[in-house]
């Protein structure tokens, strides 16, 4: 019973769970959910679904990064002061997620061909940027897994 109480009061299990949720969410959204929806839905419905899913996904991503940072053992976020470079991947994930959250899409309905062409160009640019930011976040999340493993192997 004592061992369970010590574990429950330790940051490590919460840190591992939040990091695992972050990595799992990124992998699932990037490689499973988007691919299946793209293949199964007509384009109009796929785009409508993505407009609803992605903002929630990016908010969850940022929230999980914060949760991962504040549960870093042994001293919460202050633990990064001892190993400042361990925070770099999480900062990268947080920044890329926040940038994706900040992208605003104009949903106004217009029939002006020039405005439609400009909106399509803006959407294409934002979509490409979002894909690249998500790839950077995924690489940074895996990178953090290796820095965390190194810290655990060296006794934090």
UniProtKB/Swiss-Prot annotation:
Cellular component annotations (GO), alphabetically ordered:
membrane
Which subcellular locations apply to this protein?
Membrane
Residues carrying covalently attached carbohydrate according to the record? 107, 120
Positions of transmembrane segments: 131-153
Q: In which pathway does it act?
A: Secondary metabolite biosynthesis
Keywords of the record, alphabetical order, are: Glycoprotein, Membrane, Transmembrane, Transmembrane helix
Main location class: membrane
Query: What membrane topology does this protein have?
Result: Single-pass membrane protein
Under Pfam families, the record lists:
DUF4149
Superkingdom per UniProt:
Eukaryota
Q: What does this protein do?
A: Part of the gene cluster that mediates the biosynthesis of the isocyanide xanthocillin and its derivatives. The first step of the pathway consists in the conversion of tyrosine into a vinyl-isonitrile intermediate by the isocyanide synthase xanB. Subsequent oxidative dimerization of this intermediate to form xanthocillin may involve the cytochrome P450 monooxygenase xanG, whose expression is coregulated with that of XanB.
Which protein are we looking at? Xanthocillin biosynthesis cluster protein D
This protein's species is Aspergillus fumigatus (strain ATCC MYA-4609 / CBS 101355 / FGSC A1100 / Af293) (Neosartorya fumigata)
């Amino acid at each position: 019973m004592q061992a369970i109480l010590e574990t429950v009061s330790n940051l490590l299990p919460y840190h591992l769970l939040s990091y695992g949720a972050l990595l799992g969410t990124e992998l699932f959204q990037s490689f499973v959910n988007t691919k299946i929806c793209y293949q199964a839905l007509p384009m109009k419905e796929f785009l409508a679904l993505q407009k609803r899913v992605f903002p929630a996904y990016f908010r969850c991503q940022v929230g999980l990064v914060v949760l991962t940072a504040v549960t870093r053992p042994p001293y919460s976020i202050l633990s990064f002061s001892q190993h400042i470079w361990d925070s770099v991947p999480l900062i990268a994930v947080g920044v890329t997620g926040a940038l994706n959250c900040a992208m605003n899409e104009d949903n106004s309905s217009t029939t002006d061909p020039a405005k439609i062409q400009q909106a399509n160009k803006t959407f294409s640019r934002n979509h490409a940027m979002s894909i690249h930011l998500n790839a950077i976040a995924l690489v940074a999340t895996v990178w953090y897994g290796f820095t965390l493993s190194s810290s655990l192997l060296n006794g934090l």
